[in-house]
Design a protein with these regions (language model features):
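Short, well-ordered alpha-helices that flank and scaffold nucleotide-derived cofactor binding pockets
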Residues: 17, 21, 78, 122
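Rossmann-like NAD(P)-binding element
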Residues: 46-91, 95-103
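Short, hinge-like loop/turn segments at secondary-structure boundaries
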Residues: 43-47, 108-110
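NAD(P)+-binding Rossmann beta1-loop-alpha1 motif at the extreme N-terminus of oxidoreductases
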Residues: 1-44
Length: 132
């Protein structure tokens, strides 16, 4: 199976590593096509590992993992192109936290009657959004 992963940080790489170990093809996506973390990760993981932009990763994946910081989740999906998510499963691993000078706080946009997962589902109505 082919998986696209939005993000190149620790969570994205751990998920990608395991999927590669299980014999799947994985493409890490970032804002830019030449992200150093993604390049190193792909070299380490061999022929089933690749990298590209958010758009390339989301187009590639039959299932997509969203592993960007929560404050960038909608922005990353917008950059990827919502059309690439249609009729697919999005596993959303984002958290709506803001990290600032060693302090963690909840993003005020998601501290009321809505949560980040709900906002992503509204943004992608033809996608099955799975929250951890």
């Amino acid at each position: 199976m082919k998986y696209g992963i939005l993000g190149t940080g620790g969570v994205a790489q751990v998920i990608g590593d395991k999927l590669i170990q299980l014999g799947h093809e994985v493409k890490l996506g970032s804002r830019t096509a030449n992200n150093e973390n993604a390049i190193k990760w792909a070299k380490k993981n061999g022929k089933n590992a690749s990298y590209g932009t958010f758009s390339e990763a989301s187009a590639f994946g039959e299932i997509i993992f969203n592993c960007v910081k929560g404050i960038h989740a909608i922005e990353a999906i917008t950059s990827a192109g919502p059309e690439h998510f249609k009729n697919k499963i999005l596993v959303d691993l984002t958290n709506p936290y803001i990290y600032n000078d060693g302090h963690i706080s909840l993003d005020p946009r998601y501290s009321g009657s809505t949560c980040l997962g709900e906002e992503i589902q509204k943004f992608l109505p033809n996608t099955k959004v799975f929250r951890q």
